[in-house]
């Protein structure tokens, strides 16, 4: 059973408390924002922005940030809770791409298409590294090991430059070669 997009949003809000009301999650988003400053990106895309917390923190820090999510319920939530954000269904070109816990929901073909559209110079990437009994419910269709992700991004013309351990212990930062 796959969660509907409304159930997915409800789980993020209630079960995981991925909101601006959760000081720990806000602090994590701030940590990610601080980490990304060294790249001096002209623009940032929060790809699969979910509840928009990363986007809102980046906006408050002065980044030129765009929030993107394919789910209408997530976009509507972001527009209501973060009215100053630019929120879109389709991705936009950006210098830095936040790709946090989204790729496991995508096929390799969708990943390739996203990279063609966004054309990021830097990618802060994190994707669930292990298979679980909950993958099907959460729509996890593409679980890869760290080395498999690194190989895939290498094939797309990126090199691994850091393992920042933020926002997750398995996060990776890639740079266009």
Residue ranges with predicted function:
Residues 98:
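A conserved beta-strand element that flanks and buttresses the S-adenosyl-L-methionine
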Residues 105-106, 132:
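Short glycine-rich, flexible loops that bind phosphorylated cofactors or substrates
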Residues 130-142:
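C-terminal alpha-helical "lid/dimerization" subdomain adjacent to the S-adenosyl-L-methionine
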Residues 102:
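Hydrophobic adenine-recognition pocket in adenosine-nucleotide-binding enzymes
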Residues 156-158:
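A structural motif corresponding to the C-terminal end of an alpha-helix
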Residues 1-94, 109-115, 142-148, 152, ...:
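Conserved N-terminal segment of class I S-adenosyl-L-methionine
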Residues 120-133:
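Conserved beta-strand signature within the Rossmann-like core of class I S-adenosyl-L-methionine
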Residues 106-107, 119:
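Helix-to-beta-strand junctions that scaffold the AdoMet/dcAdoMet cofactor pocket
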């Amino acid at each position: 059973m796959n969660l509907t997009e409304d159930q997915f949003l409800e789980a993020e809000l209630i079960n995981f408390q991925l909101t601006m009301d959760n000081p720990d999650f806000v602090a994590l988003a701030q940590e990610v924002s601080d980490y990304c400053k060294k790249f001096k990106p002209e623009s940032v895309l929060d790809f699969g922005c979910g509840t928009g917390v990363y986007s809102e923190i980046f906006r408050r820090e002065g980044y030129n940030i765009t929030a993107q999510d394919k789910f209408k319920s997530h976009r509507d939530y972001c527009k209501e809770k973060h009215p100053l954000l630019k929120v879109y269904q389709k991705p936009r070109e950006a210098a830095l791409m936040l790709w946090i816990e989204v790729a496991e929901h995508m096929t390799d073909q969708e990943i390739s298409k996203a990279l063609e559209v966004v054309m990021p110079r830097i990618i802060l990437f994190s994707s669930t590294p292990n298979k679980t009994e909950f993958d099907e419910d959460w729509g996890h269709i593409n679980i890869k090991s760290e080395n498999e992700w690194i190989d895939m991004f290498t094939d797309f013309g990126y090199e691994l430059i850091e393992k920042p351990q933020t926002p997750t212990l398995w996060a990776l930062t890639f740079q266009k070669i």
